[in-house]
Amino acid sequence: MKVALIHDYLIRCGGAERVFFNLRQIFPRADIYTLLYDKKEMGKYFPKTEIGTSFLQKFPKIWRKNHKYLLPFLPTAAESFDLREYDLVISSSSSFIKGVISRPKAVHICYCHSPMRFSWDYYSNYIGEQKKGFLLSLAARLLMHYIRMWDRSAAERVDYFIANSKTTAWRIKRYYGKEPKIIYPPVDLGMKQVFSTITDIPKEKYFLIVSQLTPYKKINLAVEAFNKLDLPLIIIGQGPEKKRLEKMALGNIKFLGWQPDAIVKYYYQNCLAMIFPGEDDFGIAPVEAMSFGRPVLAYRKGGATETVIEGITGEFFDDLAVESLADGVRRLTLNLSSYSPLVIRKAVEKFSRERFEIDFREFVIQALEKSGSL
């Protein structure tokens, strides 16, 4: 049986890419396809010789770095892959790649990290950001209308959806009219020993954020709150918001940029608590922090409501506002001594890689049996 694994973009290593890496472990002989590939960022995980890319890879670098330039071409790029020889297609998608066209008798399973955010949930935000006058604003609206119509059509090409959380499952039902299976993403819970050979070790305890620095992650709220609280905060991650956030931050906030896994885990192990200020469909970083016995302060929406247990593994704040987040930090600080690292670690065991592999394999076998491919 020939298997194709396909992912939206292999240009940076975030939570979705970690899931895709685990899918590769389950299907080591599968061929890999993606719309765009960055060897510098992803070559360590996916060698260039193993990757099939779309025609977008030949576009100028400035276009490839800014996806808004690529929007009109992305549906066609997804449909351009020749998958006629594959019996099983597994897409890992939060945008366009689920729209690939497989042969009629092939089984297409989509592990959906999120329906396309900017064209559905964040449509008004996206249009509001296009401050280019009436004609360009109208063009952006027409383009979004086309992309939403294409996205609905692309969802019909998927035989089976898997959602990464109840939050995502609800959105798949709402936007695509499909009933998905829920399989939580795999989280690395195994590395409990982290060697303290790291230089520049913080001399005081600190709060921690591990995140891509993009607008929807709401890191700006945390920066403003910690400016006000004057508590130590370390932020690990890279993204287009980094320079702006650094300008906002006072001396109690430190940005470390991208860091390798061993160093990230060291900071998890030694932090007071993890701060998760945005709404995400699942959110792998909070689970990683909890696997080290550290409590989490999270916004009370999205996937965090499925992973954080209030008063047991962390706390919530209710409004996307600086004062609400600051109040949450104060509460968490007062209650830190009441959290048991052992209890927190136990609570996240259900998100292990082993559990993900068992559940995913079982679902694939059932799907193939239903289709008559086994």
Q: What function would you assign to each model-found segment?
A:
Residues 243-265:
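Nucleotide-activated donor-binding/catalytic signature segment of Leloir-type glycosyltransferases, i.e.
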Residues 128-161, 169:
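Membrane-proximal helix-turn-helix segments that form the acceptor-binding/catalytic region
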Residues 266-271, 360:
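Short alpha-helical donor nucleotide-sugar binding micro-motif in glycosyltransferases
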Residues 320, 338-372:
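A charged, aromatic-enriched C-terminal amphipathic alpha-helix characteristic of glycosyltransferases
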Residues 200-217, 223-234:
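Conserved donor-binding/catalytic core segment of Leloir-type glycosyltransferases
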Residues 269-281, 294:
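Acidic donor-binding loop of glycosyltransferase active sites
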Residues 26-98:
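Active-site donor-binding segments of glycosyltransferases and PAPS-dependent sulfotransferases
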Residues 257, 310-311, 315-322, 330-337:
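Conserved acidic donor-binding segment of nucleotide-sugar-dependent glycosyltransferases
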